UniProtKB/Swiss-Prot annotation:
Gene: cysN
Name of this protein: Sulfate adenylyltransferase subunit 1
Organism field: Colwellia psychrerythraea (strain 34H / ATCC BAA-681)
Family to which the UniProt record says this protein belongs: Belongs to the TRAFAC class translation factor GTPase superfamily. Classic translation factor GTPase family. CysN/NodQ subfamily.
CDD domains per the UniProt record, alphabetical: CysN_ATPS, CysN_NodQ_II, CysN_NoDQ_III
G1, as annotated region: 31-38
A GO BP annotation: hydrogen sulfide biosynthetic process
PROSITE patterns membership: G_TR_1, G_TR_2
Transmembrane residue ranges: none
Keywords of this entry: ATP-binding, GTP-binding, Nucleotide-binding, Nucleotidyltransferase, Transferase
């Protein structure tokens, strides 16, 4: 196992113990066709010694049949796992890989570059902390580069690493690197990225991937691996209100009734007064049950079972929140939609809407606009075709309880499912409810809400004018 960690070979239990408390970071690679995404991931795995001997032997064999690097090992084949991908030399599905360093554990999503697979890329981006945008040094910023950057912005990814790849094909030119850097910065000025880094590299030769490049002494910055190890993805939580979506009711016997689910945001303590929606009934948290024993507190991302002091009716798909911090409740809402199916989105047609663990029906009332991903302009449109991104007004069959996606991704996201085929045809991010409640607030209430949001942003108060 010469290409794997020595510790794994010597003591697997010690290795697992060492890694169980490391910070988990999810990142994706995306860009235009043949920018070298799969090769980059293969290089990361190879140079960080995360390839087993049998994997390396298989890749050496496959390189002779499907490789594109001549006599050298084609590291892209480590990720391009589908036979159709290898034969065509492209990535089709989202491929996930796992590796770790001394500091972090990583989950990598290798997403497709071809425009017809943009919906796959959106799926891969939905859970990631960091996006690596690959740009071919020969061609600069392409249409897919713009599209993927825009989707990353819509999905709330704040940390972007722009990897200018194939620097070996432009003679490691500093001038070319600076041109691309300027072009990308100009394009993304309107996107809400809090952190954008740039690194020139050659995934094929390993320059600035894991090890520093001797071919680019003019670049003083960190390698890609160092950036992945050091970018602070633990941004301060601005939305701290409890949102617990019930996945199922756990009733193993007559003496126990618990509500199982994962905290989408906030925290819950034993003794907290909670409200179940949509019923509005109140109770007190009696126990927080886990496989490893009971807890006094559960935080965002934890899967737990809550038991209550009172027997109140709560079913799958309902939501538990704290008293005094209710979500938005509405049937009609505006959402940003990524359309993923060959058949266009049809206003008026009934679809299934899956919001968290709740399944209901609903339809698009109207398509407000769609985005031109090249100019970021909002264009008037009456239809959304495959890979289009637009603003759509929806009407759900039941009242949904949500927060705006920009505030809380856990309760602000939903998927659209075809009722006949059960195929997921779209993904949505809720912007705001469509109602007239904003006009019902007094001037004092509006001023107070604005003051609270400005002076106490950590309270997570929503904008009542939306």
């Amino acid at each position: 196992m010469s290409h794997q960690s020595d510790l794994i070979e010597e003591d697997i239990q010690a290795y697992l113990k060492q890694h169980e408390n490391k910070e988990l970071v999810r990142f994706l690679t995306c860009g235009s066709v043949d920018d070298g995404k799969s090769t980059l991931i293969g290089r990361l795995l190879h140079d960080s010694k995360m390839i087993f001997e049998d994997q390396l032997a298989a890749i050496e064999k496959d390189s002779k049949k499907s490789g594109t690097t001549g006599e050298a090992i084609d590291l892209a084949l480590l990720v391009d796992g589908l036979q159709s991908e290898r034969e065509q030399g492209i990535t089709i599905d989202v491929a996930y890989r796992y590796f770790s360093t001394d500091k972090r554990k990583f989950i990598i999503a290798d997403t497709p570059g071809h425009e017809q697979y943009t919906r796959n890329m959106a799926t891969g981006a939905s859970t990631c902390d960091i996006a690596i945008i690959l740009i071919d040094a020969r061609y600069g910023v392409q249409t897919q580069t713009r599209r993927h950057s825009f989707i990353c912005s819509l999905l709330g990814i704040k940390h972007i690493v722009v990897a200018v790849n194939k620097m070996d094909l432009v003679d490691y030119s500093q001038e070319r690197y600076q041109e691309i850097k300027k072009e990308y910065r100009e394009f993304t000025e309107s996107l809400e990225f809090s952190d954008v880094r740039f690194v020139p590299l050659s995934a094929l030769n390993g320059d600035n991937v894991v090890d520093e490049s001797v071919n680019m002494p003019w670049y003083p910055g960190a390698t890609l691996m160092k950036l992945l190890n050091t970018i602070d993805v633990k941004t301060q939580e601005q939305f701290t209100q409890l949102r617990f979506q019930v996945q199922y009711v756990n009733r193993p016997n007559l003496d126990f009734r618990g509500f199982a689910g994962t905290l989408a945001s906030g925290h819950v303590l034993v003794g907290d007064t909670i409200v179940a929606l949509p019923s509005g009934k109140e109770s007190v948290v009696k126990e927080i049950v886990t496989y490893d024993g009971n807890l006094e507190r559960a935080d965002k991302g934890m899967a737990v079972t809550l038991t209550l002091e009172d027997e109140i009716d709560i079913s799958r798909g309902e939501i538990i929140v704290k008293k005094g911090s209710l979500p938005i409740s509405a049937k009609e809402f505006s959402a940003t939609v990524v359309w993923m199916h060959e058949n266009e989105l049809e206003p008026g047609r009934e679809y299934f809407i899956k919001h968290g663990s709740k399944m209901t029906t609903g339809h698009a009332q109207n398509i407000v606009s769609k985005y031109d991903v090249n100019t970021m302009e909002s264009l008037s449109s009456s239809q959304l075709a495959i890979n289009d991104i637009g603003i759509v007004n929806f009407v759900a069959g039941e009242t949904l309880h949500f927060d705006a996606y920009e505030d809380n991704q856990g309760t602000g996201a939903f998927i659209i499912i075809d009722r006949l085929s059960n195929v997921t045809v779209g993904a949505g991010m809720i912007n705001h409810a469509i109602d007239e409640k904003a006009q019902e607030y007094s001037a004092f209430e509006l001023e107070l809400n604005a003051l609270v949001r400005k002076q106490f942003p950590h309270w997570g108060a929503r904008d009542i004018t939306k």
